[in-house]
Amino acid sequence: MTKIRGFELVSSYTNQDLLPKRETAHAAGYDLKVAERTAIPPGDIVLVPTGVKAYMQPTEVLYLYDRSSNPRKKGLVLINSVGVIDGDYYGNPGNEGHIFAQMKNITDQEVVLEVGERVVQAVFAPFLIADGDEADGVRTGGFGSTGH
């Protein structure tokens, strides 16, 4: 079967329950879950592991969005507002393309995320290329690895 787009576990995780799913038939987002118990001190930003990687077509991207309940119920926000997972992040030699959520604790108390809690939503989308685009770089990492 040809793979078009989807999720796989990173090799260091075996809990199939971590594979994202949509909760309703009309939901755009796949819920990504916490793969390891994670404590976030007040005011800190922590990379929360999801245990998954995503594959997609060359003209697609995966966006990570905060869950609307995070600020109100947990005191957490996805600090970069929208996470952008490029197709060439999949299979990244540094971490297999493991998706992390950059979460900030906006409370004055430690927030603990337990394994299996839903943390962010992931939405696949197409993207367009501008005229004259000549991008030919090769990904070597994640979280700003292609920046200068």
Please tell me what each predicted stretch does:
Residues M1-H148:
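DUTPase catalytic domain/fold
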